[in-house]
């Protein structure tokens, strides 16, 4: 059985050694996330859509409170992605409330509080499901940013925003100090049973994510993470999300990935019989609508948009060493 020391989360950076540091998330305003569904609610249907801004609360807790307030089952609540607790976030929730039912529609503004604000109400024809949104827009504050060479930092910043970064799963996917990976070892190798389906799903997701990061880390070390290689099954450079069925990579790339993950063969074998099907994930994370500005003192504000499922911390880790590592304990991802 593997132990905690076997699970390194120090994945290689594409742009070399960090020469800058900054304070991060000293206040919730330093991390703001706005969800983009990619479609507008239809204006009619059996599901009420609520555009909610939350501060200092996690998505699952808000969903639970919303079910209680609306008097519906927890399964009647939908949302596209978990958003960070230590932030100001705006996202959609759906509530199953057919117009013809005997269940009266609540006064939604009554759900608002000092930490939760209902900003918009609409109706739609279907429940909002996980991963259904298109992207997230981030506004991030980095305070007390220190760098030996500001010109070099600006060059690195411009290069990162223009060229993109390795599409690593963020450390928060793996739990505090990689705890989810220890749980994955117990589940996949030790055959520990998990009755909590949600917890089991999180553990399996962490395992798949860690194997993907191993493959991406190898591509970063070899310098070919931005280009397609022989055997690539997608129209873009990709890595495996292990699961049911046969691997999707073709002969050359499959041999390379299989060899790289040979020490994780026990995990791969188990993942082929549980959870979701084999998938591929892009190795390159493109950064859309990037901008930045310097505020008072050494306070840098970054703004950019990432596709669903991407991590803002994958961008930040290529720029600065973050003094406040509270982000490791919470989800800053777009769609999980």
From Swiss-Prot:
Which reaction is this enzyme known to catalyze? uridine(13) in tRNA = pseudouridine(13) in tRNA
A single GO cellular-component term on record: cytosol
Q: Which GO terms describe its molecular function?
A: RNA binding; tRNA pseudouridine(13) synthase activity
Q: What is its EC number?
A: 5.4.99.27
Which residues act catalytically here? 84 (nucleophile)
In this chain the TRUD domain maps to 164-298
Name the domain of life. Bacteria
What HAMAP family does this protein's entry cite? TruD
Q: Briefly state the protein's biological role.
A: Responsible for synthesis of pseudouridine from uracil-13 in transfer RNAs.
Q: What is this protein called?
A: tRNA pseudouridine synthase D
